[in-house]
Amino acid sequence: MSSLETPPSPRRRARWKRVDILPANIRLAEAELAFAGRIGRENLLKKALLSVSGEYDYVLIDCPPSLGLLTVNALNAANGLLIPVQVEYYALAGLALIRQTAELVRDLNPDLAILGLVLTFFDARKTLNKDVAAALADEWGDTLFSTRIRDNVSLAEAPSNGQDVFSYKRSCYGAKDYAAFAAEFLERTEGCYGTRG
């Protein structure tokens, strides 16, 4: 993919009403190199999303765990930042870097807000998980979503079987947790971005 003016693959209708997916592919790796020499490179995704902005209530952009040009494009195009946090101590250091990056990107996108943090791979039986969750609650307060995505083998098995967790095993903890999180997320963001309902 040499630019974002034309998406790398067609949007696919998901099994849910009003949900489309534009999956990444191997060509996305070329994008970072292609962006490097472009004038206005940090605005490419923002411009591409403008062409479909009236079609969606939400656009979720999954970023790589790096702070390169793809992530800067995503943060510049976004209204809000949702941060999934694996409940381990190294994640605390990573959060400081994410917060710093969000502050830097606000020079390009002053509307970028941290919508919240959601804890993932949570196991209430592990003291470390409880300690990290408590430290995050102390530091981030209400920014931390109350729903926790519990560690669940079905979350790992579903994609390896080519399915989302709801199709794979709707009754598992992972599916229930993500459904609860989606409801909490929608409640928190309702009316914030001019959604069509």
For each predicted feature, which ranges?
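P-loop NTP-binding core
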Residues: M1-G197
